[in-house]
Amino acid sequence: MGGRGMGISELKLPAAVKVHELADAKTLAATLAHDVAERLRAAIAAKGQACVVLSGGRSPVPFLEKLASEPLDWAKVTVSLADERWVPVEHADSNAGLLARHLLTGAAAKARFVGLYQQAENLDAAALKADQALTGLPPIDVLVLGMGDDGHTASLFPASPNLEAGLDLASTRRCLPLLAPSVPHQRLSMTRSLLASAAFIALSVQGPGKLATLRAALAGNDLTEMPIRAFLHDPLDIYWCP
């Protein structure tokens, strides 16, 4: 891992957090896909259906492709997104488009997809429509989160309007409109209350930069400063590679 590199094992993590330290990005993608699929198979065996909520961005592509090739009864799986950019599915920045290209192909195309993007006159109206659409989402069996260098997760960004509502565990909202510092700014995000309801939560992070972000997140407790903190003290499985 290089002389200077610090491993994730050196972080002081809460008792409920389990760490999977992988050799490289390829191994992380394969291991996470295997573990997610195993939990989805168990959910199908137990109750006849499974629900997985995934995150967008560039880094999950190898994981999504690995997950698509896992032997699963995809017709019994509901797939949704922790957050979405308020752009049509055809847009290059669409998380739904990302899933369509890299996950919902072959056998996995049989899965039911519940997206967040809604056509509406403005972002607030779109979030209300998404909130309604999510009433049909089964209980979440598996949630896979990512984390930005600023400590955001899903589209729960520090300094965004609606962030406090998005982090409120007592909130009955499933989806809220939020603003990202980067383009496209307008986002739709599942709320913490919905995300935290997942039976199994994985956080997938790569590289020393994300390790430094995790260290900073663990050192404080202001959720609005680093929203990932909202998930670091619940049962959580962190998948990390250098």
From Swiss-Prot:
EC number: 3.1.1.31
Pfam families referenced in this protein's UniProt entry, alphabetically: Glucosamine_iso (PF01182)
BP term (GO), one: pentose-phosphate shunt
Recorded catalytic activity of this chain's protein: 6-phospho-D-glucono-1,5-lactone + H2O = 6-phospho-D-gluconate + H(+)
Pathway this chain belongs to: Carbohydrate degradation; pentose phosphate pathway; D-ribulose 5-phosphate from D-glucose 6-phosphate (oxidative stage): step 2/3
EC main group: hydrolase
Gene3D superfamilies registered for this protein in UniProt: 3.40.50.1360
Keywords attached to this entry: Hydrolase
MF (Gene Ontology): 6-phosphogluconolactonase activity
Main function: Hydrolysis of 6-phosphogluconolactone to 6-phosphogluconate.
Record-stated family: Belongs to the glucosamine/galactosamine-6-phosphate isomerase family. 6-phosphogluconolactonase subfamily.
Protein name as annotated: 6-phosphogluconolactonase
Name of the encoding gene: pgl
